[in-house]
UniProtKB/Swiss-Prot annotation:
It comes from Wolbachia sp. subsp. Drosophila simulans (strain wRi). Mg(2+) binds at D482, D488. Residues 703-757 are annotated as: Disordered. Belongs to the polyribonucleotide nucleotidyltransferase family. This is Polyribonucleotide nucleotidyltransferase. PROSITE patterns: KH_TYPE_1, S1.
Length: 757
């Protein structure tokens, strides 16, 4: 029934296998990739496009369902919802790797679906998913004429490169690099780097590329065994229209020389509309005209840049656009910056929060918490277009993650700066390189906020114009240069090294020479941008803003954690309510206090420390009235513990009733004078100066006060010895003033700070 074909090799100390012919047989291409114990099913289906379009409708989906990790989804419905950010990012990596390999003019609809079948939590699925996508395309019959592969590279503490590092190895790695390419060139790069030099990054790329070759050979052998040849594809022939476009060359050249984007766009649209109307009258097809005009513009601009050494806006190849930097532009935010580079502008705003504000991420490696979030927004008005507001798409998620990778290596340890940090980048104008403007703006905003980042970070996008063996590398590309060029190579980092890379190609790869020169030219541009940024702010503010939350932390004994939290959280809740602060207690005994002011934070700290201090005679505590009886007041400490006070200890003068002095929910300071046999504290209000919190010493009572059946002697001697028959023997009366030796506080240690809240 099944005609199974399987090929495998040993690669990076694990077995990599490709298999087809057993499952998903109705797809045009179906491959199961196993690497270690991670397994991915990749299917490819193509469909002829009924309408002419001028783009490749390629849809790549990576799907990781929870059963692959042996889990049941959370939530009410118990099934997967929208794709996670991790799934979206893996889908983008695969898309960016394979999209340049389809022939120009091929516009059939292609669907590539990568289903994660099993995940061993050791071997990340990115590599087998990309390998499976290439293998499935190779046997599907679509015109896909290049064979590539993907690889991950890490770097250990001894600067040794690691091929396809495990999840645990990657956690300790100073490099997280994913690249794809064929036998001779590099096609796509995605990386987070901990300030490594350009030389180290370049060597890592060469290391990874060398280990691609066995996999490329495996895919070719696998496809040859299947024997499905790619269908023939004839490119669109628009040569007759192209000849008629030559007379518009000067008009296009003049329009592209406009440095202001809006003026350039308007001039180009006017020329295109004129051409379309003119050629349609001759009977030419509108879609064919549009296709020819697009290619004509591309060839014209590329030739001008390559031969005349002048770019669209008149800059030199390595020249950076004008930069304007402002910080603290939004008065009531925790931090803000406005970064403008040419016609690209990013408003970046920060907000600080507590551990409770951390993002809970349901990742394929398991749930984790992120204390640093970076969200990138790209509204339609940024490019002068109209569009309804929508949820963030793949592009926004990808650009935000790239900026996150660029900033993450320079963030302080959480022990040094325990705030949760959210950064939002609002792109207000865009003419290329908005993700790198986000990187620059984020670095500025974090320093304005007072986040002690290790060094400022800047980013730059590099472009490429290549014709056979001739090429020109462009620094800080415009949107049109990205659209008409061959490469978009984003490099971010500090003055000491690289922190993030992202390279996308529109051609079938570039040489190592171009990669190396691009990194060198990017460094020069990055240092120039950092110089402009440092002229405005080069170090983080000494403290967070006055209106930002204040934080302090301290440690308590682990055996005190339960008391600090209290029964059902009563103690910590009470301290938070009374101090107007947020308090978080870790398993290691670390207590983090967040408040709107430093004073409130210190009050909360004092309350929390006092609430777990052991009660003893002589302690002064804060209490609240919870119940009043005829001669007894029931009091409550902040931690929920109860105590009692006799009417005789309410005031230093005779009172007829407790209600004449106290009422429900009153709070005051009281002295612990004794404990009942059951441990219930006996308290006194009259023995504490309510203004200073100090003990009263000496004569406290009016000698003429009237004793009655509920006098203080009865209270202090209410530990009766009961005889059979119910009679009681009363203890000898205590002195009418001062303390008995048994109840005398330890006045040598009567500092109110030793109290119990």
């Amino acid at each position: 029934m099944f005609k199974i074909i399987k090929k495998s090799i040993e690669w990076g100390g694990r077995t990599l296998s490709l298999e087809t012919g057993k499952i998903a047989r109705q797809a045009h291409g179906s491959v199961v990739v196993n690497y270690g114990d991670t397994s991915v099913l990749v299917t490819v289906v193509s469909k002829k496009k009924e309408e002419n379009v001028d783009f490749l409708p390629l849809n790549v989906q990576f799907i990781a369902k929870s059963y692959a990790m042996g889990k049941i989804p959370g939530g009410f419905f118990k099934r997967e919802g929208k794709p996670s950010d991790r799934e979206t990012l893996i889908s983008r990596v695969i898309d960016r790797s394979i999209r340049p390999l389809f022939p120009e003019g091929f516009h059939d609809e292609i669907s590539v679906v990568c289903n994660l079948l099993t995940y061993d939590t050791v071997n990340p699925p990115e590599v087998p998913a990309l390998i499976g996508a290439v293998a499935a395309l190779a046997i599907s019959g679509v015109p896909f004429h290049f064979t590539i592969a993907g690889v991950m590279v890490g770097c250990d503490e001894n600067n040794n490169y690691i091929l396809n590092p495990s999840v645990q190895e990657m956690k300790a790695s100073s490099l997280d690099l994913f690249l794809s390419g064929d036998e001779n060139s590099i096609l796509m790069v995605e990386s987070e780097v901990k300030e490594l030099s350009e030389e180290n990054v370049f060597n890592a790329i060469k290391f990874g590329h060398e280990h691609l070759k066995p996999v490329i050979k495996l895919i070719k052998e696998f496809a040859d065994t299947i024997g499905n040849k790619p269908e023939s594809f004839a490119p669109i022939d628009a040569s007759d229209i192209t000849q008629e476009l030559e007379k518009y060359g000067k008009d296009f050249e003049k329009a592209y020389s406009q440095t202001v984007k809006q003026e350039r766009v308007q001039a180009l649209e006017a020329i295109r509309e004129n051409i379309l109307n003119t050629l349609k009258e001759t009977g030419k097809d509108e879609k064919l005209i549009t296709y020819a005009v697009k290619n004509f513009e591309r060839s014209l601009v590329r030739e001008i840049i390559r031969k005349k050494s002048v770019r669209i806006d008149g800059r030199k190849h390595d020249e950076i656009r004008q930069i304007e930097v402002e910080v603290d532009i939004l008065s009531k935010t925790h931090g803000s910056a406005l970064f403008t580079r040419g016609n690209t502008q990013a408003l970046v705003v920060t907000a600080l929060g507590t551990t409770q504000d951390e993002q809970i991420v349901d990742d394929i490696e398991g749930d984790r918490r992120e204390h640093f979030m970076l969200h990138y927004n790209f509204p339609s008005f940024a490019v002068g277009e109209t569009s309804a507001a929508r949820a963030p798409g793949r592009r926004e998620i990808g650009h935000g993650k790239l900026a996150w990778k660029a900033i993450h290596p320079v963030l302080p340890d959480k022990s040094e700066f325990p705030y949760t940090i959210r950064v939002v980048s609002e792109i207000l104008e865009s003419d290329g390189s908005s993700s790198m403007a986000t990187v620059c703006g984020t670095s500025l905003a974090l320093m304005d906020t007072g986040v002690p980042i290790k060094a400022p970070v800047a980013g730059i996008a590099m472009g490429l114009i290549k014709d056979k063996d001739e090429y020109v590398i462009l620094s800080d590309i415009l949107g049109d240069e990205d659209y008409l060029g061959d490469m978009d190579f984003k490099v971010a980092g500090t003055s000491e090294g690289v922190t993030a890379l992202q390279m996308d190609m529109k051609i079938s790869g570039i040489s190592f020479e171009i990669v190396e020169k691009s990194l060198e030219q990017a460094k020069a541009g990055r240092l120039h941008i950092l110089e402009k940024m440092n002229a405005v702010i080069s170090e983080h503010s000494d403290d967070v803003k006055d209106h930002a939350p204040r934080m302090l932390s301290f440690y308590i004994d682990k055996d005190k954690i339960s008391a600090a939290i209290g029964s059902k959280g009563k103690n910590i809740r009470s301290v938070c309510e009374r101090s107007n602060a947020k308090i978080e207690i870790g398993d290691d005994g670390k207590v983090s206090v967040f408040a709107t002011s430093g004073t409130e934070a210190e009050i909360a700290k004092s309350m929390m420390i006092d609430s777990i201090t052991e009660l003893e005679q002589g302690s002064i505590v804060d209490v609240k009235v919870v119940r009043i009886e005829k001669s007894i007041v029931e009091l409550e400490f902040l931690n929920g513990r109860k105590g009692k006070m006799h009417i005789s200890e309410v005031a230093n003068e005779h009172i007829d009733s407790i209600e004449s002095v106290l009422k429900q929910d009153d709070t005051f300071k009281a002295l612990v004078i004794d404990f009942e046999k059951g441990g219930c504290p006996k308290l006194s209000r009259r023995r504490v100066d309510q203004e200073t919190g100090e003990f009263f010493e000496g004569e406290l009572y009016n000698e003429e006060r009237k004793d009655g059946p509920n006098d203080r002697d009865n209270y202090y001697n209410n530990s009766f010895s009961r005889k059979p028959g119910g009679s009681h023997h009363k203890r000898p009366p205590r002195p009418r003033s001062g303390f008995s030796n048994r109840n005398r506080p330890k006045f040598g240690n009567n500092d109110s700070s030793s109290g119990f809240y």
